[in-house]
């Protein structure tokens, strides 16, 4: 999916300007049509005014104090859906439970299009539709798309500290 990203910034005198206006490319995940489009992110809390340049990003999820925004496109599930999700999330995924993962982030997930399921540790799944919002507090979870078309979710993640690793306190 093509996404137009408009970024604001400041001149050296502090005046607000459009720093960039361009399309952002998607990164395909597997061969079934799922993708991620990184909209913006940074490893630090930021300081303004700035010129609107893209800050550095060191990982797929931000460290404490960092943030990231992305659009996830989830293809309808098939037999291999969670296997390729697991492979794409390898450092954060549960190797024994395909698709389950946990990150040290506070996530704000907004369903833009389609119907998705959010499953937590207890196996209970909540069904979400366009306009629904999930506040994900570093919990172990997996996403489902049980429909027959692509589902789109805007995910804004804020890096946090987490005292649980792999389901066990650290």
Feature locations, PLM:
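N-terminal leader/capping segments at the start of a protein or of a new domain
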Residues: 1-52
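Conserved short histidine dyad/triad with adjacent acidic residue
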Residues: 23, 55, 68-103, 137-140
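A short acidic/small-residue loop/turn micro-motif
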Residues: 24-26, 124-126, 142
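Compact, glycine-rich, soluble single-domain proteins
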Residues: 54-61
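Short, conserved beta-strand element in jelly-roll/cupin
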Residues: 73-75, 101-118, 159
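A short hydrophobic beta-strand segment most commonly corresponding to one strand
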Residues: 107, 133-142, 148-165
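Short acidic-glycine-tyrosine-enriched beta hairpin
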Residues: 120-138
């Amino acid at each position: 999916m093509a996404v137009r990203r408009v970024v604001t910034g400041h001149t050296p005198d502090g005046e607000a300007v459009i720093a960039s206006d361009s399309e952002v490319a998607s990164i395909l995940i597997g061969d079934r049509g799922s993708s991620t489009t990184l909209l913006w992110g940074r490893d630090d809390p930021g300081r303004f005014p700035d010129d609107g340049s893209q800050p550095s990003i060191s990982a797929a999820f931000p460290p404490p104090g960092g943030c990231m925004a992305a659009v996830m496109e989830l293809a309808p599930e098939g037999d291999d859906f969670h296997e390729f999700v697991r492979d794409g999330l390898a450092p954060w995924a549960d190797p024994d439970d395909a698709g389950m993962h946990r990150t040290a982030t506070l996530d704000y997930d907004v369903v833009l299009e389609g119907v998705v399921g959010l499953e937590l540790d207890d196996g209970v799944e909540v069904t979400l539709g366009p306009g629904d919002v999930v506040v994900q507090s570093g919990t172990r979870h997996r996403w489902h798309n049980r429909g027959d078309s692509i589902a789109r979710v805007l995910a804004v993640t804020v890096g946090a500290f987490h005292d649980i690793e792999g389901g066990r306190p650290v």
